[in-house]
């Protein structure tokens, strides 16, 4: 919108797009502001001289400020031409009344906006406090509180919508009233002023200003203002132009002469201060802080300057573009009128707010400090501190409880339990203290206690066991009938030592294993396959018969199908024979009795049958069901019949297996070979083992590198009932471990790590590991103070032999002496073994193994003893003799005689000497003596001197008198008896 000026018009013309600039006398200075944390900033301060503006003529009712209405045009009648301007201008001819009124309106609107924004900020803060209280209440009733917040939000929105709607109605009504007043006040150059209208009602729910009277029509312009009352001319303003010759009738010539005196207009009453509520307050923007804001003035009808404007000149708009830009977007619509055009209501364009427009609303300037409109608003630093405090309160808000699914193993530490629940460990310890338990965060609790704690804290518990890693490792599903095929029987030969078990097996295999065994006794468990006369294969397992190999015999009975009990015809049933019978009964396998050595002259097979009846074994020849065969390993008599009986028993048992499934078996024996590494003798029981399979045996795993049968040949696979040597384990497994094929290495590592951990825990529990309390250690130290121990390190050739040695040596000893095995393993003696033995003063025992060169050198340097054995008998006997030498001897007293004290003599440099008479027996010098007083032992020691008269005597017999003195004792009295005796030491044995 632009102004069209006639040649006679001297008013200022401005483009709407240019901002309003005022050239004032300005003084500048600097002020240093201090902020928190030692920060400061220099600020340029402008000092502007305050301009005094005279009061407007006429009595005008104050304007009623309302909320910003939505744009809505109003239809009004066109306004007549403005009357001629009176002579009320300044010496420079600049019109200032309209400009100052617009400026005051803009500043009043800016103040209202600032107060409204500040009120909204306070309302938001109050809403945040209320929301925080609601969240605290929502800990117990979360759903109800959430529903309440939702209803509250809906109510607040509804109220805001209602406020906006009513504010829009008020604004529309006000705009219509202003338009009507503007239309009525156009031809008022000589019309009398109308009475003020009644006050307009205020909307019910609108939180706006207090009710004020509605504006009345402006009165007729006054004749003239005094020259002294004219405000200073605005710099840069154009002089007022004279009226054009083509003015409308009644308008031209209506302007009085500039020098004509005009009666002074009545002074306008002071505008009542508007009461700004919380909803209309907003922070001040930059336009307000740039210059001092005048007090808001009441609205007026079109000024005489505008009314008296000559015809042909477009009427000045009611709101200048520069002033409109300074007003908030909530201002009411403007009413403008152009010559020859209908009256229009124009809504000023909305100025978009910049993101940081309100950032500097609290900056201190001279103009801001001297304005006096309102108290100084909050600074940026203060606002930031308030935001930080609010954010800190939000951080202190209690977090909502989150129920989690907690997985609890069999044992768990308090710290780990707290981490899984996302709780504090101190809270867990506090709950345990309520239950009467005192713990640290590193203590281990059981699964029941952990479940109780987790449920107490509102979590869901899912209990698992560490052994779950072994689930699915073996399949218990029965095999299909079409997959089952006959397999060879597994026969275990058991019996007493030297009853001919290995010789019998050699005769069947046509081999000579006995000569290869040290001492002619079996110290390893062996597995072989033999072809029966019918051509079928039979798998034999040879077990030791020595008492130390009980565990070997038990393993052999568990993996077998048939047990052959070998009994010598000349010895009969012996202790290990009875033990073998018990193992077979415990395993639930059928037994066959082989009566060996029938070729001897003193053989008595019938005595063997009779002795077996004492152990509930009735052979067929005596009406029972147990098969018995008389055989001779030396001559080979009865061996074919024995093999036929084994084949018949296998057919009765209908032994079948599935070769198509993954292989499973049992470790019969294991050893550490220096060239091949860990080697395990495995008996395959189900499925088939292939080269390259990943297998797990106890706490060891590996990939099969090679399969070797009993004849030493490499085979690609091994089926059911086939004994093979397996190479490829990463460690030596224990004899009796289950061998299982797993799909991948990850699964193998998972299983073996769990088993190794369980193995360590059991070892610590058995030897007293880290879980022992101080009381336990003190009790054990007290109990073991008088017990002597022999530390030993054992290295053997195979796992079974080492196990047998451990069992035999552990059984030795009593409460006074015993064996403490520091280390036992398979393989040669290494330098680390010597180092351990030197540190603990232990003896190193090698069973069928030798020490490495480095180990020998270290043993010679440190003086460590290494003993080599190949027969378990010799090893056990030597250790037993060593323990016997550690036993304290038995003391036995031999009474010599008795004497009575008759007189006490004091001898210088000697002390007291007792004059005695030997009552019975003999008293010897250097013998042990015991002083008795009233049949109570007063002292026990040794005789220091023995004299007969004045000569030293070796002994004094009964009836003679002598003098005696004791070692380190002088309290002797007349009438005491002295008993003389000798102490004899007797060597003890285990």
From Swiss-Prot:
Enumerate composition-biased segments (Polar residues): 1-15
* Region annotation G5: where it falls in the sequence: 632-634
GO CC annotations, alphabetized: cytosol
Q: Where is the composition biased (Low complexity)?
A: 74-92, 181-209, 225-270, 302-325
Q: Where is this region: G3?
A: 542-545
- The region called G4 is annotated at 596-599
- Here the segments flagged for biased composition (Acidic residues) are 467-483
Where does this polypeptide localize?
Cytoplasm
Regions of compositional bias (Basic residues) in chain numbering? 383-392
Q: Which family does it belong to?
A: Belongs to the TRAFAC class translation factor GTPase superfamily. Classic translation factor GTPase family. IF-2 subfamily.
| Name this polypeptide is given | Translation initiation factor IF-2
Species this protein is from = Methylorubrum populi (strain ATCC BAA-705 / NCIMB 13946 / BJ001)
């Amino acid at each position: 919108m632009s102004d069209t000026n006639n040649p006679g018009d001297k008013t200022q013309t401005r483009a709407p797009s240019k901002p309003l600039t005022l050239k004032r006398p300005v003084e500048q200075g600097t002020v240093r502001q201090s902020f928190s944390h030692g920060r400061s900033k220099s600020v340029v301060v402008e000092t502007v001289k305050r301009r005094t503006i005279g009061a407007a003529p006429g009595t005008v009712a104050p304007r009623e400020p309302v909320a910003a209405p939505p744009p809505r045009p109003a239809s009004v009648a066109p306004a007549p031409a403005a009357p001629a301007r009176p002579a009320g201008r300044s010496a420079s001819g600049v019109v200032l009344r309209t400009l100052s009124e617009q400026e005051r309106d803009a500043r009043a609107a800016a103040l209202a906006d600032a107060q409204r924004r500040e009120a909204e900020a306070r309302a938001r803060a109050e809403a945040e406090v209320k929301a925080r209280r609601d969240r605290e209440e929502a800990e117990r009733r979360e759903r109800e509180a959430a529903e309440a917040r939702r209803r509250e939000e809906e109510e607040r929105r509804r109220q805001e919508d209602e406020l906006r709607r009513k504010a829009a109605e008020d604004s529309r009504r006000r705009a219509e009233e202003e338009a009507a007043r503007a239309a009525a006040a156009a031809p008022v150059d000589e019309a009398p002023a109308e009475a003020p209208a009644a006050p307009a009602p205020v909307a019910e729910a609108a939180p706006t200003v207090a009710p004020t009277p509605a504006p009345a029509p402006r009165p007729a312009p006054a004749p003239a203002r005094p020259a002294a009352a004219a405000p200073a001319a605005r710099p840069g303003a154009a002089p007022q132009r004279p009226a054009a010759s083509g003015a409308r009738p009644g308008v031209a010539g209506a302007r009085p002469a500039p020098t004509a005196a005009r009666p002074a207009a009545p002074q306008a009453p002071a505008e009542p201060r508007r009461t700004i509520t919380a909803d209309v307050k907003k922070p001040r923007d930059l336009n307000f802080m740039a210059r001092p804001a005048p007090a808001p003035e009441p609205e007026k009808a079109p000024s005489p300057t505008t009314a008296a404007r000559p015809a042909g000149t477009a009427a000045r708009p009611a709101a200048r573009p520069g002033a409109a830009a300074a007003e908030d977007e909530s201002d009411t619509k403007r009413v403008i009128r152009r010559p020859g055009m209908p009256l229009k209501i124009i809504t000023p364009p909305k100025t978009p707010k910049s993101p940081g427009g309100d950032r500097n609303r609290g900056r201190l300037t001279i103009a801001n400090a001297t304005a006096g409109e309102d108290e100084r608003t909050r600074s940026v630093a203060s606002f930031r501190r308030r935001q930080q405090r609010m954010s800190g309160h939000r951080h202190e808000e209690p977090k909502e409880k989150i129920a989690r699914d907690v997985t609890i193993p069999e044992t768990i530490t308090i710290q780990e339990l707290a981490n899984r629940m996302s709780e504090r460990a101190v809270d867990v310890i506090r709950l345990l203290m309520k239950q009467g338990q005192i713990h640290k965060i590193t203590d281990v609790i059981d699964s029941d206690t952990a479940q109780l704690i987790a449920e107490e804290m509102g979590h869901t518990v899912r209990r698992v066991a560490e052994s779950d890693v072994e689930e699915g490792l073996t399949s218990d599903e029965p095999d299909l009938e079409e997959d089952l095929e006959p397999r060879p029987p597994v026969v275990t030969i058991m019996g007493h030592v030297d009853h001919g078990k290995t010789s019998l097996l050699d005769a069947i295999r046509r081999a000579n294993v006995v000569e290869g065994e040290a001492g002619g006794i079996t110290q390893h468990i062996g597995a072989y396959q033999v072809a029966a006369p019918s051509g079928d294969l039979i798998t034999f397992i040879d077990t030791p018969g020595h008492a130390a190999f009980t565990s070997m015999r038990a393993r052999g009975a568990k993996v077998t199908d048939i047990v052959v009990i070998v009994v010598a015809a000349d010895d009969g049933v012996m202790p290990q024979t009875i033990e073998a019978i018990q193992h077979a009964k415990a395993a639930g396998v059928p037994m066959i009795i082989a009566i060996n050595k029938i070729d001897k002259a003193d053989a008595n097979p019938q005595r063997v049958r009779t002795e077996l009846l004492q152990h509930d074994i009735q052979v067929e020849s005596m009406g029972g069901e147990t098969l018995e065969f008389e055989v001779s390993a030396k001559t080979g008599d009865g061996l074919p019949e024995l093999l036929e009986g084994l084949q018949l028993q296998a057919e009765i048992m209908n032994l079948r297996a599935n070769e198509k499934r993954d292989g499973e078996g049992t470790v019969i024996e294991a050893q550490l070979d220096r060239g091949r590494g860990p080697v395990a003798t495995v008996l395959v029981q189900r499925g088939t083992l292939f080269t390259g399979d990943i297998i797990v045996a106890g706490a060891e795993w590996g990939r099969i590198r090679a399969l070797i049968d009993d004849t030493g040949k490499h085979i690609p696979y091994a089926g059911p009932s086939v004994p093979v040597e397996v190479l490829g384990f990463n460690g030596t497994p224990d004899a009796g471990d289950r061998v299982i094929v797993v799909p991948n290495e990850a699964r193998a590592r998972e299983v073996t790590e769990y088993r190794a951990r369980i193995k360590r825990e059991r070892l610590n529990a058995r030897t007293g590991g880290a879980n022992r309390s101080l009381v336990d250690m003190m009790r054990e130290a007290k109990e073991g103070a008088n017990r002597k121990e022999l530390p030993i390190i054992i290295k053997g050739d195979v796992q079974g032999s080492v196990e047998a040695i451990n069992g035999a040596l552990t059984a030795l000893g009593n409460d006074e002496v015993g064996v403490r095995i520091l280390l036992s393993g398979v393989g040669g003696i290494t330098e680390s073994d010597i180092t351990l033995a030197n540190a603990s003063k232990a003896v190193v025992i090698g069973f069928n193994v030798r020490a490495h060169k480095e180990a020998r050198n270290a043993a010679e340097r440190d003086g460590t003893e290494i003993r080599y054995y190949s027969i378990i008998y010799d090893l056990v006997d030597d250790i037993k003799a060593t323990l016997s030498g550690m036993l304290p001897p038995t003391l036995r007293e031999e009474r010599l005689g008795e004497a009575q004290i008759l007189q006490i003599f004091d001898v210088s440099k000697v002390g007291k000497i007792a004059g005695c008479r030997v009552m019975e027996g003999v008293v010897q010098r250097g013998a042990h003596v015991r002083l008795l007083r009233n049949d109570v032992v007063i002292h026990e020691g040794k005789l220091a001197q023995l004299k007969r008269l004045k000569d030293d005597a070796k002994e004094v017999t009964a009836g003679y008198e002598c003098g005696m003195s004791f070692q380190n004792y002088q309290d002797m009295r007349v009438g005491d008896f002295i008993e003389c005796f000798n102490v004899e030491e007797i060597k003890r044995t285990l």
